[in-house]
């Protein structure tokens, strides 16, 4: 599995602001979008381009355009919605595919409760977004679902990742790419990433 920890100073600065205990909902939400945008920039650096000729202000001019790669952004409900706009800033034509997961209280396994995927997802690059990669269970289940629907090209963007989640994701899906703003220290006994961001969903949506 390709693993990229984006160490750009802007990413580190903005993530540091998100870690503050007193960060407001508005600021956290804005920062999630901004860091998502910066991660998208890194994750799409290998998109193939082609030369096309257009009519410029002074006549015909050759320009580069993305070559034939259709994209769908896949936010995992609900926290993933907080990063979605950051992807769409760069790829406004991307289709949106939504996956909802909940954790079974007895088995502790993720269970999909909602999905609405692009009808031609097998032809698209899927960019899956979720702020946290903790145990990796929800992400693995989401990628399982995408592959079942025929999706072959998958990249994952997360704000923070725990080593435990990275290991689990690599074991389950070694063919995907993972981009994160930070590889944090560990998971605590309650499954929270340390130092992490706390409950990213609550902070994005202003709920407790």
UniProtKB/Swiss-Prot annotation:
5-phospho-alpha-D-ribose 1-diphosphate binds at residues 78, 103, 130-138, 199. Catalyzes the conversion of uracil and 5-phospho-alpha-D-ribose 1-diphosphate (PRPP) to UMP and diphosphate. This is Uracil phosphoribosyltransferase. Belongs to the UPRTase family. It catalyses: UMP + diphosphate = 5-phospho-alpha-D-ribose 1-diphosphate + uracil. It comes from Mannheimia succiniciproducens (strain KCTC 0769BP / MBEL55E). Keywords: Allosteric enzyme, Glycosyltransferase, GTP-binding, Magnesium, Nucleotide-binding, Transferase. GO terms for molecular function: GTP binding; magnesium ion binding; uracil phosphoribosyltransferase activity.
